[in-house]
Design a protein with these regions (language model features):
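ATP/nucleotide-binding catalytic cores
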Residues: 1-142
Length: 142
């Protein structure tokens, strides 16, 4: 099974939150880009300070999504399935309101997946039962 198949299976699992720890978040983001080309799912990427954009349309930022609170309000209000890749979201996870909003998204009626992507993720305890966790710790030999 290749990486794209594994990634697709993770997204199809019954978890609304996925945490992915990796030494190479850029490579994983590239895998999401590749996966989006062969999928009917809508994929979005959020980066701190840059906001949210749909993969394949990075030049079009989604308004009012730069701040984590506004981003999660946007994700919660989406009426369609989407995969939302949040890069380096640890600072926001320290805020109790952020955790509550993620729990609300995880329990929502509209199926969507929030992917927390970073080299290390300090996952708050209340989110652990709702989160599929993945750690990729191999470094490339050089």
């Amino acid at each position: 099974m290749n990486y794209l198949d594994q990634l697709d299976q993770m997204l199809d699992a019954n978890f609304r939150i996925v945490s992915m720890e990796t030494y190479d978040p850029e490579r994983v983001t590239d895998l999401f880009t590749q996966l989006s080309r062969f999928s009917n799912k809508a994929f979005y990427v959020w980066e701190n300070g840059a906001g949210l954009h749909r993969i394949g349309a990075s030049h079009i930022k989604i308004p009012r999504t730069v701040v984590p609170k506004e981003l999660l309000e946007h994700v919660d209000s989406c009426k369609h399935f989407g995969v939302f890749v949040l890069r380096d979201f640890n600072k926001a996870l320290a805020d109790e309101k952020t955790v509550q909003m993620l729990l609300r998204i995880a329990a929502g009626e509209v199926s969507k997946v929030v992917v927390l992507l970073s080299d290390f993720i300090d996952l708050p305890s209340p989110l652990k039962p709702f989160t599929l966790r993945s750690k990729h710790q191999m470094r490339q030999a050089g």
